[in-house]
């Protein structure tokens, strides 16, 4: 009763009640991979701030009349700097507006959700974090590459590859210092590299230098779970050249480890679940290349000595 009376008195005095911010994970890309809670919140949103990684199909789930604001956060350019995004959310909430902050994957896995939650907490703004299926989980399922497997990997590690060439990290990820290469190069482990396309040659070189075999299976999954998904499979030695050859673009994840070899068996079935194309054979850079998949899902597997089955 006391709380209700105080709220009533505040309204009488003309005080604006701050709005609430929902930090919502949009999942790996496909709209039907949203959680039930995320779908419900999105369907009721009146004001939505989203990153460039959120797929158009998900944005279409917002109700008619909802205000959608792209705040960017692409690696090559930012529509708004991170500090400005937090300031905008705080300002909108203080003006009495509740809003949805929609982020690709899960907000707390390389989504800067933790920083945004800290900013809201420091400003006294009420917020809620709604988890999402991570990009790594979506990529693993849609590419047919399990993150763990008793015969291949007893651990999995997520890392960001978005760093400066001098290894000192960068302002976007807040990464201070180089990656722990010894940790990433452990045997019987799956390493998933987020935002790693720009530094892929360095990542592969460092992993080999720290003990992983050059023929360790590795893959890039581009646009996981979405139309146009591509899975490029090679090894640590060949993957950077394959990424350049096939003009791979973000959003994409890099997966490294023995589990990648299971793609040859599980990839087609995984592709069928997400989408169904005739195999195309070709030759590129001296390697036999097979493109296969289903509907809009394409697999590019180079057949080189010590990497993958000879099909």
Regions found by a protein language model. Give the residues of each.
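Short secondary-structure boundary/hinge segments and terminal tails
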Residues: 59-60, 79, 110, 138-139, ...
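Alpha-helix termini
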Residues: 38-42, 118, 124, 137, ...
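Generic beta-sheet signal
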Residues: 51, 71, 130, 159-161, ...
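Class I S-adenosyl-L-methionine
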Residues: 1-31, 36-133, 138, 240, ...
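A contiguous loop/helix-start segment that scaffolds small-molecule binding in enzyme catalytic cores
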Residues: 1-11, 17-21, 84, 94-99, ...
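Short hydrophobic/aromatic-enriched beta-strand-loop microsegments
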Residues: 66-73, 124-128, 147-157, 211-220
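Class I SAM-dependent methyltransferase SAM-binding "motif I" and its flanking Rossmann-like core
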Residues: 106-187, 230-233, 308-309
